[in-house]
């Protein structure tokens, strides 16, 4: 069996931290032939879909062979693991991968869902599980909401890994000017969400496979910051899921399955859903290190069962 990973250039990956590296290594341990390419390596000539890909020896990390042009139908599964931003190149790649899916190839996550699920806006499908939230472009509406909530977090809809998050008081001087900046003079919507003080104790990244939680890690912000993302200096800690968090997972599960979102990372703060990460969820390495479980192997095993 062959699997293809569509992701950032391999030389950019830090194997000790990267979930894609963990998945490739687990696939290799399962006797799967692992190949890799970037979105720019995908192509279609008529109805012939292919990728200029390299064979990967993922463990020990990493060696590659010579690039070859291979039909996408040669792969039992294609993982779309390119990190955001979800820009034009990313979107075009999902269109090509959707053609492969129509040709019978399993593509994870489903390309149409990757286009449809903005990682901030997707959570609004479950707004009953979230903190009070407003998405808007009008400064007057955003400012009124911020004053109502007293303290909020501004979230650019295209941000990732904590980039661009701003904590601000509703009564802060210059609030309107800040909102003008983040909305590009009311040309772009932004998410404004009630600030949850419990985030200082951390948020939970929960990894779901086919709708079921397989692992979780608590991410505690560094001193003086409220952003718990590991890329922003957050510290990973072992954790267990409580009944509320299991309830959130259970409510998401049927929708994630129906949408073809096989591998997803959700963020939960104080029992409230914050984000649903579908592009290239991280956290495998941290769960494996803190809990001593072979999480990546479990993900690949679930995939092999689903492939039959």
UniProtKB/Swiss-Prot annotation:
Superkingdom of origin: Bacteria
Coiled coil feature spans: none
Domain ATP-grasp span(s) in chain numbering: 120-304
Enzyme Commission (EC) number: 6.3.2.3
Keyword check for DNA repair: no
Keyword terms, alphabetized: ATP-binding, Glutathione biosynthesis, Ligase, Magnesium, Manganese, Metal-binding, Nucleotide-binding
PROSITE patterns listed in its UniProt record: ATP_GRASP (PS50975)
Record SUPFAM superfamilies: Glutathione synthetase ATP-binding domain-like, PreATP-grasp domain
Pathway it works in: Sulfur metabolism; glutathione biosynthesis; glutathione from L-cysteine and L-glutamate: step 2/2
Family label: Belongs to the prokaryotic GSH synthase family.
Protein name in the entry: Glutathione synthetase
Species this protein is from: Prochlorococcus marinus (strain MIT 9313)
Higher taxonomy: Bacteria, Bacillati, Cyanobacteriota, Cyanophyceae, Synechococcales
């Amino acid at each position: 069996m062959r699997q293809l990973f569509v992701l950032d250039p391999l030389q950019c990956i830090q194997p000790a931290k990267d979930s894609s590296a963990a998945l490739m290594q687990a696939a290799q341990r399962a006797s799967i032939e692992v190949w890799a390419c970037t979105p720019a390596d995908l192509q279609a000539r008529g109805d012939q879909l292919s990728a200029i890909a390299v064979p990967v020896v993922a463990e020990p990390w990493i060696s590659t062979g010579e690039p070859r042009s291979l039909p996408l139908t040669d792969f039992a599964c294609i993982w779309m693991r390119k990190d955001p931003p979800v820009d034009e190149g990313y979107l075009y790649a999902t269109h090509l991968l959707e053609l492969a899916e129509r040709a019978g190839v399993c593509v994870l996550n489903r390309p149409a869902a990757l286009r449809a699920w903005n990682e901030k806006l997707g959570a609004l499908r479950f707004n009953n599980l979230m903190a009070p939230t407003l998405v808007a472009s009008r400064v007057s509406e955003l400012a009124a909401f911020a004053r109502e909530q007293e303290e909020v977090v501004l979230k650019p809809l295209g941000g990732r890994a904590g980039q661009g998050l701003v904590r601000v008081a509703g009564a802060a001087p210059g609030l309107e000017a800040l909102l003008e900046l983040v909305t590009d003079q009311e040309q772009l919507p932004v998410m404004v969400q009630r600030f949850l003080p419990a985030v200082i104790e951390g948020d939970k990244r929960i990894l779901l496979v086919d709708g079921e939680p397989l692992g979780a890690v608590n991410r505690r912000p560094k001193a003086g910051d409220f952003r718990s993302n590991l890329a922003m200096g957050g510290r990973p800690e072992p954790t267990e899921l409580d009944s509320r968090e299991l309830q959130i997972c259970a409510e998401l599960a049927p929708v994630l399955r129906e949408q073809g979102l096989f591998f997803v990372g959700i963020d939960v703060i104080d029992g409230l859903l914050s984000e649903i990460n579908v592009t290239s969820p991280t956290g495998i390495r941290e769960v494996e290190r803190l809990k001593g479980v072979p999480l990546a192997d479990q993900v690949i095993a679930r995939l092999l069962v689903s492939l039959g």
